[in-house]
Amino acid sequence: MLNIIATRSILFYQRYISPFKGSSCRFYPSCSHYSLQSLEKYGFLKGLLYSVRRIMKCHPFHPGGYDPVK
């Protein structure tokens, strides 16, 4: 149930909020796509942990780059 809520929240963000922000993620795949993939692969708790860790790295002082879900 929590996994579904988290996934739908991310999809809402991707569809309605992200287009107005422009491309600002330093990583590929983007942080929202990474979060969806980690939730799908690892489930809610571990996927949320990976997502938060990734979002914490997404700032101007981190070089970014290719960082897939492992």
Swiss-Prot record:
Keyword hit for Glycosyltransferase: no
Subcellular localization: Cell inner membrane
Topology within the bilayer: Peripheral membrane protein
Keywords: Cell inner membrane, Cell membrane, Membrane
GO cellular component: plasma membrane
Pfam families: YidD
Function per UniProt: Could be involved in insertion of integral membrane proteins into the membrane.
PANTHER family: MEMBRANE PROTEIN INSERTION EFFICIENCY FACTOR-RELATED
Family classification: Belongs to the UPF0161 family.
HAMAP family linked to this entry: UPF0161_YidD
Name under which the protein is recorded: Putative membrane protein insertion efficiency factor
